Amino acid sequence: MEKQKTMRRRLFSYLLVLLLLGGGCAASHKSLDQRIFDVNRGTETTLAKVLPQLKKDRVILVGEHHTDENHHRMQLQVIRMLHEAGMKVAVGMEMFRRDSQPELDLWVAGKIDETAFEKIYDANWSFPWSLYSPILLYARDNRIPVIGLNVPSDITRQVARTGYQSLSEDQKGYLGNVACRVDKEYMDFIRQAFGGHGHGDMNFLYFCEAQMVWDTVMAVTALDYIAQHPDTVMVILAGTGHVRKQAIATQISNRATIPLTVFLPEVPGSIEKDLVDNRDADYIWMTP
C-alpha cells in the first residue's frame, strides 16, 4: 500500500511538472515567449530576449508569493531556460535552512526518495509540497544543486521580539557574525514592502532587524557558494519582500561587485509596472 502511495505521489508530481511546463519543446518555446516588463527601459519584452543578459549574471533573483503556483511556474521557466542554454545553474532557496544542506545534496544526487525528502521539506517549510515539487524534481533529475539559504525561524523570531542584541554569541556565530545595522532607508523599504508591522517604534525596529538578518544571511550564503563555484549562476527563489533590490540584492552588492538581475511577479495593487521602478526590480513578470 505504501509503495502504491509513493508511486501515485511521484506520478502526480511529474504530471504537475508537465502541466506547468506544457510538455516538451513546445513548452520551452512558450516559456521563452513569456511577457516581461523591462523596468529600466519602460517597455515589454520576452524571456528569450533577456537571455543574453542573464547569461552574464552571477545571481538572478526571482520573487514569489509563496502560495501562487503561477509564480513558481515562472521560477522554473528561468531555471530551465538557463540550464537548456548550457549554463551551470544552482538554485538558492529561502525554503530550506542552511543546516539542511547535507539532505539537499543527497536529494540532488538521487540518494533520497521523494517520500523521505518530502518530510525534510515539511520540516523546513510550511507551504504545500506540491507548490515546489516541480522545481525540486527538475533540479534532482538534472543534477542542479539546491542550496539552502534560510535562517532558523527561532532566531528570526527572537530578533523580531527582542532585537539583534539579544542573540547569544553562539547564535551570532551560527549567522556568521553578520552586522545588523538598520538605517532609515531600510526601515522605509520595510514599511513599503511589509505594511508596517509591529506595535510601536521599538517593535518595528526589531522587525526590521529580523528582516535585515534574514536578507544578509541569505546574501552571504549565496556569495559563499558562487565564490566556490565561479562558473555557476545562482537563481535565488524567495518571497517578494526579500527579492526587491533593497533586500538580498543590496546585501550582495554591498559585499561584491557582480552582475545580478531581479525579477518580481506582477501583483495587482502592489507590484505593477506603474508602481515600481529600477530601485525595486529589473523586470516584472506580466500576468498571463
What do the PLM-derived regions correspond to, one by one?
Residues Q4-F12:
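Bacterial N-terminal signal peptides that target proteins for export
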Residues Y14-G23:
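Bacterial N-terminal signal peptides
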Residues C25-P288:
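Compositional signal for N-terminal targeting/processing segments
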